[in-house]
């Protein structure tokens, strides 16, 4: 897949350039934001992901932060097999390093929602990945990309590490714009507890 140029070579650099799959080889059964952030994210999912819909939880882990809604199908993706096996919200999952291979093994228009929580800061080729998010979304499907100020700093790209929270909003919006085919992009901002809550929400239009 051709990479829409969003980040320069300098901007996509990481302090730790070793393979990501080695960094994530050991499972981490922790959450990467406080309870207030997670509660706000679950409420946003409840408001945006259609009930009985099909959801793709990209860059997931042992927990998806989805509400108790009975979705038709939930597919997860991540870098640690043990964590994904532990996630009881996933009907299906796969392991793939998106910095090595941006092509998702998923059908066109297969999902009503694509979710990416607390992980976008690690993408070195976000234009290509977001293009894939758009490809697997059905028409009028929703993309929800959430983040806070926490990260593994050695694995976050330079553009993210050096940006303010407002700058990070702009980065994610630029990823959506580079992918093409999205509209009605909005940013949800909140401060439920200590961790600031941000989410970029966009709709797929073919």
Regions found by a protein language model. Name each.
Residues 112-127:
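A short SAM/SAH-binding and catalytic strip from SAM-dependent methyltransferases
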Residues 43, 47-104:
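Class I SAM-dependent methyltransferase SAM/SAH-binding core
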Residues 101-114:
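A short acidic, Gly/Pro-enriched loop at the edge of an enzyme's catalytic core
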Residues 142-174:
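Conserved class I S-adenosyl-L-methionine
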Residues 180-181, 189-206:
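Core SAM-dependent methyltransferase catalytic element
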Residues 127-142:
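A short glycine-rich, Lys/Arg-flanked "PGG" loop and its adjoining helix->strand segment in the class I
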Residues 2-50:
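Class I SAM-dependent methyltransferase Rossmann-like catalytic core
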């Amino acid at each position: 897949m051709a990479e829409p140029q969003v980040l320069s070579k300098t901007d996509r650099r990481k302090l730790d350039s070793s393979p990501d799959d080695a960094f994530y080889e050991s499972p981490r059964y922790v959450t990467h934001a406080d309870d207030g952030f997670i509660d706000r994210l679950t409420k946003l999912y409840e408001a945006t992901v259609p009930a009985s819909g099909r959801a793709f939880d990209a860059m997931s882990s042992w927990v998806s932060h989805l509400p108790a809604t009975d979705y038709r199908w939930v597919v997860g993706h991540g870098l640690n097999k043990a964590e994904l096996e532990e996630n009881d919200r996933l009907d299906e999952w796969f392991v793939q390093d998106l910095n090595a291979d941006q092509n998702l093994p998923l059908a066109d228009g297969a999902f009503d929602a694509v979710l990416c929580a607390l992980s976008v800061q690690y993408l070195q080729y976000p234009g290509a990945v977001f293009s894939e998010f758009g490809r697997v979304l059905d028409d009028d499907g929703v993309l929800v990309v959430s983040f806070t100020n926490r990260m593994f700093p050695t694995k976050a790209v330079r553009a993210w590490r050096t940006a303010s929270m407002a700058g990070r909003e702009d980065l994610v919006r630029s990823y959506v714009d580079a992918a093409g085919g999205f509209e009605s992009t909005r940013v949800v901002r909140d401060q439920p507890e200590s961790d600031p809550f941000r989410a970029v929400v966009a709709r797929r239009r073919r």
